[in-house]
């Protein structure tokens, strides 16, 4: 796929569009990259459907990871180490568009079925079975809520580290601090948790280095 380009927040978006680019903050993604992704994914879907019409999102993501060879990919390493990836927003964005278009071209008895409930069972077991559980949450949104919401069923996480640039003043879940989670039983106590107001891709690698190497 085409590489992403470093752009700017302060650009003329009509000009960006005229150049067949799409802006994500200060990152530009070309139309060609989306076209290439759709073609690759459509071919992958055709092969996948030869084995099963039912998609369990975490299993599907693992199969994609097995097809990748790029060692910079999170999906590649997760599949290699058999680490499940759960995506509550699985049908959002381009991926959802691909599923819709793919199904529109197929007969009723050939259409894909996305079994999100099967993933809920797997995910909740991972949350409920350990004696203690903690979370490192990068950013926020639906992924953060999916995790801490599930923790309500065990009276909350034991520990949490939030790394986010979000703020809490508009009721934002992404910006909500650990102490708010205590009121929902999403977190047992804010004393064993911390919120770091920082950009996660800058801070998390530094923390990971310390955890791995001890300094």
Give residue spans per PLM region.
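General beta-strand structural signal in soluble alpha/beta enzymes
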Residues: 85-89, 138, 162
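Ligand-binding beta-strand-loop-alpha-helix segment within the catalytic cores
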Residues: 12-94
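Gly/Ser/Thr-rich loops at beta-strand to alpha-helix junctions
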Residues: 91-94, 139-145
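C-terminal functional extensions of proteins
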Residues: 132, 142-215
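Active-site rim loops that border cofactor/substrate pockets in soluble metabolic enzymes
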Residues: 88-135
């Amino acid at each position: 796929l085409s590489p992403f380009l470093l752009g700017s927040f302060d650009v003329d978006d009509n000009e960006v569009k005229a150049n067949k680019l799409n802006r994500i903050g200060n990152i530009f993604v070309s139309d060609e990259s989306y076209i290439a992704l759709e073609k690759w994914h459509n071919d992958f879907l055709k092969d996948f459907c030869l084995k099963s019409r039912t998609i369990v999102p975490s299993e599907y993501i693992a199969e994609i990871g097995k097809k990748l060879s790029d060692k910079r990919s999170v999906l590649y390493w997760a599949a290699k180490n058999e680490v499940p990836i759960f995506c509550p927003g699985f049908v959002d964005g381009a991926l959802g568009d691909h599923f819709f278009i793919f199904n529109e071209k197929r007969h009723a008895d050939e259409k894909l079925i996305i079994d999100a409930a099967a993933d809920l069972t797997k995910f909740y077991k991972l949350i409920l079975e350990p004696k203690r559980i903690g979370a490192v949450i990068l950013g926020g949104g639906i992924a953060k809520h999916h995790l801490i919401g599930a923790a309500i069923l065990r009276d909350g996480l034991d520990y949490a580290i939030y790394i986010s640039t979000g703020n809490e003043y508009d009721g934002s879940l992404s910006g909500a601090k650990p102490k708010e989670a205590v009121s929902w039983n999403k977190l047992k106590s804010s004393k064993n948790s911390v919120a770091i107001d920082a950009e996660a891709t800058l801070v998390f690698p530094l923390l990971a280095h310390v955890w791995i190497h001890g300094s």
